[in-house]
């Protein structure tokens, strides 16, 4: 082509159709193929790679070390005791991950093997998707999915445009228009494309779906033509072609370098407060384990210092043992004790927690109260790792538009040339009395006629001044609505289904036959309003825009579009009128338009904008500028240079936009209404009652934001509203913050609300962060207006890292809000009608803001209660399990004799005690869901991770240690030293004694779980009592047969011997009742003396028509403690149908039905109690 391609690392050069230079001096760049690989493993690397990933987890690695120690040295327990549970956990996880990866392989093969047509050697060749190379020209037909990231070359339309939907990428269902450059748009056949000689230079792959910079250099008749390429030219892999027969595009990014593949990379992992607490507890128990092992080792050597205990006759040392190093023996004994006590660390905790989170997350999607019938949207769970975090929220950060409001804009009022109008039935009516007005209104439709594309007010106009003023007023009105009709990115679909987009296709259609769609609802509302007034936008091509003005078609040449961005907060178009005049029309926030204006009714319009904002309306200002031919030539050249730049294109474009968008003439302002969603006020008030602070972060102007905050209850009328706005310097900002802090201190009795704008916020965070945070912490509600997206994310991070480390939620609905959702501890996406990018990138997605109350107060409350109890109970039952093993060493002179049989050691956590806590963690409801939602104050009872505090952790730990003492010493004293408890005069041996302790322990920890359960179903009964029955049946079976593959038969007939002894049964019942009686007494006294709000609500529930869900500890108010204890003992002993819950029971579904309650479980006949 006569030039050397660039070799910068941040750009790539693509020769269309892979026609490389023939001069031999060019070395083609290497690009990857078009295969998509979403799988993690292959047949050859699955085992080593999966094992490596699993053993990176601390718990798995710990048990692997224990297993290896058991293999290397002589330990008191079989390696099977730690090896089998570890093998079970690793195997289950590997099977799950292997199956998921197999599904990914199948999906990859289906995608990579999809048939596509590629232009090669002057014809269409059918091949597979994986064979597409960068530079290939690909043909895509209607409704097909793009197999790679393509730059559009041509379509079946004359203007080279096409429509696509990107719903699978960003969730937006509206059609997007993409256009080809003019030089390739005419190449609509394979033969024509075969003559194309062109090169594309573009940036290297990146994940941003909305960013693409490049240029196409076309050689025609030995002349090079350079055209800029942007996002409008790029067709993304995964998007679908719509309303277009076929297109041709050249592949620029393939395979794992496509934007779709780059966006599939996992998000940064969020860790919940419960997970952090669990890791802390693991470290504490690891310290306890090491301490017990060290103490045991020291005591062993202290004991054996006396000769009579050194070498008992049954355990004589060998010569090698006598001569071995004491240090090595000490280490060996320490490791042996470590193995003996290692089960204090629960290996199955991680697996159980993962299962609980995964299965529990389905309840959110199944909840009909979170289903929005109008949009047919149910709640979505994109991550199950944060379920319990929903019960710990202290701050809610939310956007206004689309989150608190419906995002359905309706044009209400406008200001034109310093006069205010409101729309009534397609007529612009001036507000207030007008001179010489007989009817009191102005019909714009009847008052406009056009001469040379300008309108004038006819004699029928109800508002007349002088002819000169009329002409000026007419021009301003005309330009205002032309600006509204031309300055936008709205697209059109009509009643026609074919041929859409072929030139001026809508010219003959009536406005009622046109349907506008746009990514911005503001633009759609304004264009529709202009159409009702009489200036109808009827279609556009790449180069023209057409409007009908009172039935007369006018075609404007679209010269340039200066796209909207959040920094400028405005957009502009440069058009050429039929008269040849060139105009720039701009619209945007008043803070971005008014400073650029040098003419027009600036002050009057500013007042009108403030008045609109006080009504809660969204405002935009409209302005224009007319260019001379010389001015336009300079602008056109500078825009071309900036748009064709491959380096720093965005910065260069920003400079050019700043140069163009100045010296504007203000035309007026628009005001559209975005009404609040249903029950927003009630939801915000409920959040406030729950102790959750709500911050609204919006880009709207100050007055609009305050008005909406008042109307939605974010600010209430009795609240003292403080303002930190319009600050110009650091010193001024600091002084204002100090004044606000003093006012809060002086008026500490009343609630305060704070309003901050983006400029003042930047100053406050720059030098006065601590002072600003002090003011915010003492405010019940904070409103941040005129905020840029980056500022929103920064505010959330500021609260997250504050000393209190509060849990935050971010609620947003827009694609530019993803960073805020990902910054918050929990991201909540609001599923709008057309904007679902935020929902897809969130942790949870709901259809309406009002659903947030049930998500937090019911689901969050239940999830936290369940998993907090699960974690504490797991450590409790393992303390009960291992502490007797430690205490037993005092009786066997620390000889490392195990108390339990190896099979019991292996199955305790896997089979005997795992299911009751798992079912509890899935189904538990300690109080009726409706009460939780109607009494938001109950949310405070679980805030700040109360159930996993050090105090609660110590209670469960001490409880476990105390029960362990009862198990061991109770068994020892009840069966008696040297006592004969069998009919044949024999005594209990070591294994019988250990089995007795184990039996009491299994029954006690299982019934303890029953005491903690408030919500009983047949599943709870099955797994709770079934676990105890299974233990007895298994023990009878295990001890009743001689198993030839076992190394020893220590347990043969042991359990049968135990259960045949009446004394043993007496000991079992007495110890179980003793342990549980103490638990029951503590529950009664706590509820009588220090009841929480939740427990008081349970008492209320007891006396209401809904029966109490706390089957053990809910008693009528005024009942004496003695009576309460008697009732509780009756319930413990005769625990028939514990809850008697009346929640729309369903006999048809044995598990649950969802009838607008979180769970509805199958009934049991309460009359039997």
Swiss-Prot record:
Gene Ontology molecular-function annotations: ATP binding; ATP hydrolysis activity; magnesium ion binding; phosphatidylserine floppase activity
CDD domains linked to this entry: P-type_ATPase_APLT_Dnf-like
Cofactor dependency: Mg(2+)
Keyword match Magnesium: yes
Swiss-Prot/TrEMBL GO biological process terms: phospholipid translocation
Major location category of this protein: membrane
Membrane-spanning ranges: 48-69, 75-96, 282-303, 334-351, 869-890, 903-922, 953-974, 990-1012, 1018-1039, 1058-1082
EC numbers on record: 7.6.2.1
Any one Gene Ontology cellular component term annotated for this protein: endoplasmic reticulum
Highest taxon of source: Eukaryota
Membrane topology summary: Multi-pass membrane protein
Location of the protein in the cell: Recycling endosome membrane; Early endosome; Endoplasmic reticulum; Golgi apparatus, trans-Golgi network
Residue numbers carrying Phosphoserine: 1146
Region (Required for binding to the RING-finger of HLTF): 794-802
Active-site annotation: 399 (4-aspartylphosphate intermediate)
Catalyzed reactions: ATP + H2O + phospholipidSide 1 = ADP + phosphate + phospholipidSide 2; a 1,2-diacyl-sn-glycero-3-phospho-L-serine(out) + ATP + H2O = a 1,2-diacyl-sn-glycero-3-phospho-L-serine(in) + ADP + phosphate + H(+); a 1,2-diacyl-sn-glycero-3-phosphoethanolamine(out) + ATP + H2O = a 1,2-diacyl-sn-glycero-3-phosphoethanolamine(in) + ADP + phosphate + H(+)
Role according to the record: Catalytic component of a P4-ATPase flippase complex which catalyzes the hydrolysis of ATP coupled to the transport of aminophospholipids, phosphatidylserines (PS) and phosphatidylethanolamines (PE), from the outer to the inner leaflet of intracellular membranes. May contribute to the maintenance of membrane lipid asymmetry in endosome compartment.
Protein known as: Phospholipid-transporting ATPase IF
Gene: ATP11B
